[in-house]
Amino acid sequence: MTNTIKRSAAVLAAIMFSAIGAQAAGMLAAQNGMTLYVFDKDKGDQSSCYDDCAKKWPAYVGTADEKMPADWKLAARTDGTMQWTYDGKPVYFFAGDKAKGDAAGDGLGGVWHVIKE
């Protein structure tokens, strides 16, 4: 992990993310406390997770009026929603995570990974 990613993750944690559960383990979580993931099969900032995949891995969607650090951007999905990207990679939740701090999706299929500080 580069120093830029580490610095950005720290800024993001201070600005947007909660300090419960996943955050305490060095994993980034949304304000609702649910762990955030990236997918190795995505190409750049474009998601390749739709249909059945998106049911298991819901996109972390947002709007342009939300304020985020520089490493966080919005990318259009084919369904018209805007998905958050972190360091150029689309960001997801895992439907199998049931409680704040769960990270049951980490490493699944060798292609899903928790975003870590």
Describe every region a protein language model picked out.
Residues 2-7, 21-117:
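Compact beta-sheet-dominated domain cores in extracellular/mature segments
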